Every structure is written in C-alpha cells, then in structure tokens.
Amino acid sequence: MVIPGFLATDHSTFALRSGLATSGYDVHGWGQGTNLGASEARLERLARDVALIADRREQPVMLVGWSLGGLYAREIAKRAPDHVARVVTLGSPFSGNPRSNRVWWLYEWINGHPVDALPIDCDLSAKPPVPTIALWSRDDGIVASASARGLPHEADATVELSCSHIGFTFEPAAIAAVIEALRTH
C-alpha cells in the first residue's frame, strides 16, 4: 500500500504505484482522498484497510509512505505489526522537531492543532517492530534531511537519494530505490 503525503491524493503517487506494479507488486492506494492531516479516525480506517488486505492475501502488507503518509505507515506498523511486513518512508519527518519542515504552519492552519501535539496517541520517532527503511534526500526542500533520516535507533536502514520532496513519487531513481528497499532490507 502506498500512502500519500500531506495535501496529496492517490493521484500524486500514480507513477510510484505504477512502477511497483510493473515490478510485480500487488499495489493499493490509500483510498481516502486528500491527506489533510493526522486524525485517529483516518488512522483507524487505514489500519482496517491494511488488515483486510493482509487477511485477503494471507500475508502481511508492505507499507510505503510519502511524507505524512510515512508517519501513518509507521504508526500502523506499531499498532498492528502482524499485518505489516515492512515500512518504507519517503521524506517522512519522523525524527526530531516536527517543525523542521517548511509546511508545519500550513498543517497547523488547516488542522487547527499544533504540529507537535497531534490528536493521535503516538511516538513518531519510535521505530516500528517490523523492518523499517527511511529514504531521505538532502535536496528534499520541504522536510529537513535529519528529520527524514532519523537517528540510528529510529530505522533499520536509511538510504540517501538525490531528489526533491515530490520527486520521491515519480523520479525513476527514487522508484528504483523503493523497489530495492522492499526487496532487500
């Protein structure tokens, strides 16, 4: 399953999902329209969808989350590790100060709560109990590289790319890195 970032939809991850499908993966979008921000209801619905896919396929699901979508992926893996095989985050701000990105103010304006006081019970930097790979870029432009890379204990592996924040979803090298992370880490 590929989970889009803040203010993004499944349409924005089309190239990434197509690349994964071409590589033989059974790919699902998140199916919740525009990702407007963190909410317990949205996270619970996503967790139910992941459980349904895992039950139908009789195996855990691999989650790929771009930006805010990666935070959802990490939290679902913590809540339901039996349903998640691994997590790959793409420029997701899971480590350090939540204001270390360029759109925190927009998130707060749209959602009406501080970016460092999310309305869900979570510890963003805690590593999920499944293999967790963080893809990050010094050239991201939106999320600080340290926030998306994390500290050594916050991910099992980190992979540096050279792409913009939105480039994680369509640049061929980024798509290839996601496929590699799903296969080998």
Where are these regions (language model features)?
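Serine-dependent carboxylesterase/thioesterase catalytic core
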Residues: 1-11, 15, 21-32, 37-130, ...
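Short glycine-rich catalytic loops that host catalytic nucleophiles or stabilize transition states
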Residues: 30-32, 158-164
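Catalytic histidine-centered segment of alpha/beta-hydrolase-like enzymes
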Residues: 39, 164-172
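Post-His helix in hydrolase/transferase enzymes
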Residues: 43, 170-182
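C-terminal alpha-helix
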Residues: 49, 53, 177-185
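Conserved strand-to-loop "acid loop" that flanks and positions the catalytic carboxylate
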Residues: 133-141, 161-163
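Conserved alpha/beta-hydrolase "acid-adjacent" motif
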Residues: 141-147
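Active-site regions of enzymes building and remodeling cell-envelope glycoconjugates
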Residues: 148-161
